[in-house]
Amino acid sequence: MKTFFLKEKQINKKWFVIDAEGLVVGRLAAFVATLLRGKHKPEYTPHMDCGDNVIIINAERVHFTGKKLKDKIYYKHTGYSGGLKKTTPDNILNGKFPERVIEMAVKRMLDDGPMARRRFENLYVYSGSEHKHQGQQPEKIDFASLNRKNKK
């Protein structure tokens, strides 16, 4: 029996929408990374972008467990000497772009490389409850009801 490999024409992408209000960031990011990679599908092929498109709304209302909201530190470097910058999730959520908390969590749960960058483009995060993808008729996923630990 030959191994089945998915062809580009056989890829069937769905659209999902998840309301992030009250959800735990890490659990949500792990679930979304699985959807973006397509690992939930029986026809998953590692070298193809067979994952689905995911829309996350209410990104500014996510929760962190424990004291991570104040104690967790995100690092980035400018490239210049002494250019190490630090910030916390609390600063990001109260800042100009609160959706970046979820974007960073999901991006860091995907592998590195060109395929992961292409998969990450299928993620759409909005801080409010409105999104501009109504024409795609996304399926709503109630992530909080999948496990009691998903919601805080």
From Swiss-Prot:
Keywords: Ribonucleoprotein, Ribosomal protein. One of its GO terms (molecular function) is structural constituent of ribosome. Belongs to the universal ribosomal protein uL13 family. One of its GO terms (biological process) is negative regulation of translation. CDD domains: Ribosomal_L13 (cd00392). The keyword Ribonucleoprotein applies. HAMAP family: Ribosomal_uL13. InterPro entries: Ribosomal_uL13 (IPR005822), Ribosomal_uL13_bac-type (IPR005823), Ribosomal_uL13_sf (IPR036899). It comes from the Bacteria. Pfam families: Ribosomal_L13. PANTHER family: LARGE RIBOSOMAL SUBUNIT PROTEIN UL13M, RIBOSOMAL PROTEIN L13. This protein is one of the early assembly proteins of the 50S ribosomal subunit, although it is not seen to bind rRNA by itself. It is important during the early stages of 50S assembly. One of its GO terms (cellular component) is cytosolic large ribosomal subunit. This is Large ribosomal subunit protein uL13. Part of the 50S ribosomal subunit.
